[in-house]
């Protein structure tokens, strides 16, 4: 460990390789950087004072006349998201693969003391939600029976070879009536009704604070930068020691 540390400290080219790799990681994260800039540059506004055809940021209560049920726990809500992943392979070659992912697209309202706006989520909408349900299974431990039935209805098989359980992770997230949410997107109007959708501009919906949303995007950039730095250093050491 000391030898490796001394090598790193005494060879500035290693730092340069790491810096270049980190910079490449940041460049690859240009989408996340764009989101960070959008969040920072867009002030939170009262719904009643929102300008049309501009990027806006709102915080308000979720509401809808059309209540739906989440597919896993059948929770009454106005928006849900489900992700199911399965561990495939073994040892160092094992990896988690998403086998099912879906999001509801029913419209709903967000209101504050000054007005309301109709939200139209779609498949491209970015949801940053807390995990309301987080379950996992392994060879010798099963998912809850109700979750197994729900997954079967969704076309997801929880059993593998010789009826052993698959290694799976199940996440369900939802927004309930009255939950406070954060929305960032472009404001428009149709027949006098204010609305935001993901067609004309990317839509971000979260049940967390603006600061936590920023944190999520920031750490994605940091992770990519660190990975880039590690790869840069590894490539430098590989080619210089051949």
Identify the residue ranges that each predicted region occupies.
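Juxtamembrane non-transmembrane segments of integral membrane proteins
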Residues: 55-90
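N-terminal Sec-pathway targeting helices
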Residues: 9-15, 219-224
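Charged, low-complexity helical/coil segments in non-catalytic cytosolic or luminal regions
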Residues: 78-184, 188-193, 212-220
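Juxtamembrane boundary at the C-terminal end of a transmembrane helix
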Residues: 232-242
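Short, strongly hydrophobic alpha-helical membrane anchors
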Residues: 1-9
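Cytosolic-side membrane-insertion boundary helix
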Residues: 199-228
């Amino acid at each position: 460990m000391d030898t490796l540390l001394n090598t790193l400290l005494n060879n500035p080219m290693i730092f340069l390789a790491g810096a270049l790799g980190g910079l490449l990681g940041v460049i690859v994260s240009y989408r996340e950087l764009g989101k960070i800039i959008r969040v920072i540059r867009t002030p939170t506004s009262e719904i009643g004072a929102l300008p049309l055809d501009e990027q806006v940021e709102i915080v308000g209560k979720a509401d809808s006349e059309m209540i739906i049920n989440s597919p896993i726990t059948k929770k009454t809500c106005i928006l849900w998201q489900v992700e199911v992943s399965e561990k495939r392979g073994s040892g160092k070659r094992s990896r988690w693969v998403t086998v099912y992912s879906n999001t509801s697209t029913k419209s709903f309202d967000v209101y504050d003391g000054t007005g309301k706006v109709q939200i139209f989520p779609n498949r491209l909408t970015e949801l940053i939600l807390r995990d309301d349900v987080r379950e996992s299974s392994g060879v010798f431990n099963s998912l809850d029976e109700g979750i197994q039935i729900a997954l079967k209805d969704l076309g997801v098989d929880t059993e593998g070879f010789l009826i052993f359980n698959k290694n799976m992770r199940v996440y369900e997230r939802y927004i309930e009536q009255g939950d406070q949410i954060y929305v960032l997107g472009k404001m428009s109007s149709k027949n006098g009704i204010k609305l935001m959708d993901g067609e004309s501009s990317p839509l971000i919906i979260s049940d967390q604070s603006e600061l936590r949303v920023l944190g999520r995007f920031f750490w994605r950039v940091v992770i990519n930068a660190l990975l880039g730095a590690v790869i840069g250093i590894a490539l430098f050491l590989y080619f210089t020691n051949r």
